[in-house]
Structure formats: structure tokens, C-alpha cells
């Protein structure tokens, strides 16, 4: 995830975009920076229910107890939103993820107001799935 910005830089970059077209392009760019997900990880166990698009998220834990997230989607915007979520949860333990509320960050970005209802539901489904999987690891 080295190619992705940290939380603060994400917010700065996002607010520097002149309009929502630029913001959507930035979100898509973030999604393109995610590492490729292995074909074997695109399975029903890793598929996120509640998303209109196909979404897979894999959660692992490194030797230091830090959660590592990988994922993919067949929709560019959704993959970009996934990258935003991964940035917000970067360098956290499972317990940190369970207790961290991403919604204030979305509010700072005015993100949820500019998503279609189906994308907002999909974003919530991704967050719920990550938190639920993290809870089993904490």
C-alpha cells in the first residue's frame, strides 16, 4: 500500500480537487493503485454481500499484529472507495479497526452526500465486513 497516501494527505488531496468530477477521478486513481488481488482470493468467502458490484476483501494480520487489507472490485469507483477505506484503516490492529469510526472522515470529505444510495450502501457493507472480520481477529 506504499503508493497510497496517509489519512491526512488523502483529505488534503481530496479538498484540493476543484469539483466532484476531479474528486471522482482521484477516487478512481486511488483504486488503480491497489495491489492486484490473486485470482484464488476472488471467492465467495471474501465476497462482500450488500454491494451491487462484485467486491472482494481479504484481511490478514502481520507478525506485529497490524491488519493488512487487500481487495478488488469490478467497478472503478467502488475500488477507489475501497482504497479510501483501506487508507483510513492503514497501520491499525484488529481492535483499532473495530473501534475506529470512519464516518467523520467521510463527512470531512463530504463523500457520502455525493454518492448514489447504492454506492453508499456498498460502502457501508465494506466497512461492516472489515469490522466484523477484524472483530474475529481481535
From Swiss-Prot:
Oxidoreductase listed as a keyword: no
Primary location group: cytoplasm
GO term, biological process aspect, one: iron-sulfur cluster assembly
Entry keyword set: Cytoplasm
Subcellular location(s) per record: Cytoplasm
Gene3D superfamilies found in the cross-reference section: 3.90.1010.10
SUPFAM superfamilies: SufE/NifU
Functional description taken from the UniProt entry: Participates in cysteine desulfuration mediated by SufS. Cysteine desulfuration mobilizes sulfur from L-cysteine to yield L-alanine and constitutes an essential step in sulfur metabolism for biosynthesis of a variety of sulfur-containing biomolecules. Functions as a sulfur acceptor for SufS, by mediating the direct transfer of the sulfur atom from the S-sulfanylcysteine of SufS, an intermediate product of cysteine desulfuration process.
Any one annotated GO CC term: cytoplasm
Transmembrane stretches, start-end: none
Keyword presence, Phosphoprotein: no
Source superkingdom: Bacteria
Lineage: Bacteria, Pseudomonadati, Pseudomonadota, Gammaproteobacteria, Enterobacterales
Protein name: Cysteine desulfuration protein SufE
Disulfide bonds: none
Self-association and partners: Homodimer. Interacts with SufS.
PANTHER family referenced in this protein's UniProt entry, alphabetically: CYSTEINE DESULFURATION PROTEIN SUFE (PTHR43597:SF3), SULFUR ACCEPTOR PROTEIN CSDE (PTHR43597)
